[in-house]
Amino acid sequence: MDTGLANSKESLRDAWDEMILVLEEARNAIDQPNMMPPPANDRNLAEGYRYLMGFMHAAVERAFHCDPARPQFRNALSVMTRGTIDNADAVYFYTPIDGREQYLIRGCAEDTSHWQGRATANGVRKAPHYVIFEASSGCLAGDSGDLSELRPGMKTQTGRLDSSLIEVNPDGSFDILLAPERPTDYKGNFICTLKTVTRAHPTDPAMEPERYATYVSGRQLFNDWEYEEAIHFEITQIGNAGTHAPAYSPQQAADDIRHFGEIVRNQMVFWNAFWTIPMGTYGERQGTIPGIGFKRNVFNQINAASGATGGGMSTNLYAGGIFELNTDEALIIENRIQLQPHYVGFQLGNLWGESMEYANQIGSLNGHQMSVDPDGVIRLVIAHSDPGVPNWLDTSGHPEGFMSPRWAYSTTPDPEQWPSISATKVPFKDIRSHLPESTAFVTQEQRSEQIRIRQRHVQRRFRAF
């Protein structure tokens, strides 16, 4: 056999064998206590394997089909790759880039009147309620497999642009230039891919202060699921259109195989540790921080997105909590808003951080879907069965799970203008006595219609062709 061919076979088999071992480490994160998984029960174990497969699905694209010279936007999270308490209202997108180069993003949206604060016509197709692009230096959240990535300075946002500032042509089209600096004669939409920092990198003090973006990511947030349509984005590295990558080689394949396994393992390890240690989701365990933990049926303090929140959309305010309910109990949430955000949403997640079913069941609600009471308070009801009230959130049978409210502001308001949120546990049979008398009754037919709209929207949002 040709020596070169024999070496290729051996190196590829070695890479494959290493990848299988690394995937076994990822699998161990489902049920080995030292890997800090959620408490074991039949459903948590079953969903843990599905959760792992979601990371494997995403890692195929990320390891084998990402090229900063010829980028393509891909789903970072979706109905098949749920995690990190993903927002049921969002398309998460990302692509790797080289921030030293220039890129052009193109899109074409339906009616964008609401981006400029104008009313849209009833019954017409619309752009997503809110869109944001963010260019960042560093790894995607969780890729290091180590909580040290949360330290200030490990990641740097170099620029961002949201739909309140995107200039759109009359036909709905728009372009966005990404570059280390804005060309002097350029007046259009722009995102900077370079930021010079003044503090040394926490793990590499010798690193130069220039931080070039390594990826661009973002969200499309949907409010009116019946009429808002996802936007297809194209991205091109300027000066590189019409080129192709070098022929795929055994060395590249071996590198990609290893990278695939590392992505999966590191994501499993990181998020288990994140929920267990800084968040204290499961109470005090070995290695947790004394006094830090999610109390049940209450919310922690609202925070702006940061490393402490595991990243997140940079314009968001977040709160968090864990519901814990018996079948004869419910949780009534009261959300008071002073300064109207661009977006408000409330999502439920299982203890792996997967969003609860939001197409075939109502595991989330947003500002368009929520009913607001006459006193201006948004009251939501978390319960295991339908209480026949407008703002019901379905636990999908989980006795406990994450509660994740979100409020998005283009400019973060002063803390005294932030919303407030609280929770009260009540007997299921007494729900209506804790709600205003004006609270409507929702019939089974009306609930089915709500779910029909959700099912159709989710199919459109994540269509593959």
Segments from the language model and where they lie:
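A compositional/structural signature for long, glycine/proline-rich flexible linkers
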Residues: 1-465
